[in-house]
A protein has these predicted regions:
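Short beta-strand->loop micro-motif that forms the acidic, two-metal-ion catalytic signature
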Residues: 38-44
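Catalytic core of pol beta-like nucleotidyltransferases
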Residues: 1-21, 31-32, 36, 47-103
Length: 103
């Protein structure tokens, strides 16, 4: 799992450069209450986000899913959208902030 998470982070760093704000593991894997069927929840927050960039991020993560034969649930947000979710006290933003483990 550590190798997979390291690969996600390093691959995204190459793709996004200084546009990447944070990559966070959250959900059952971060809390430690996962089982063998649990997916891996990853939140990726970037400074700016276009439709094309979002597609590139999902493609990169899909390649890693195939390589490691795992299911990765990927949430990609711009800095602005993440701030909006936090301000509106949306559960997903709270979960990422509270239980998330930065990669």
């Amino acid at each position: 799992m550590k190798t997979l998470l390291s690969e996600i982070k390093s691959t995204l760093e190459k793709l996004l450069g200084n546009n990447m704000m944070k990559v966070v593991l959250y959900g059952s894997r971060a809390r430690g209450d996962y089982d063998t069927e649990s997916d891996i929840d990853i939140a990726i927050v970037v400074r700016w986000l276009s439709r094309e960039l979002k597609k590139q991020i999902f493609d990169v993560v899909a390649d890693i899913e195939v390589k490691y034969l795992v299911s990765i649930s990927t949430l990609v947000l711009s800095e602005e959208n993440f701030a909006f979710l936090k301000k509106r006290e949306r559960r997903i933003a709270a979960d990422i902030e509270k239980e998330g483990i930065p990669l």
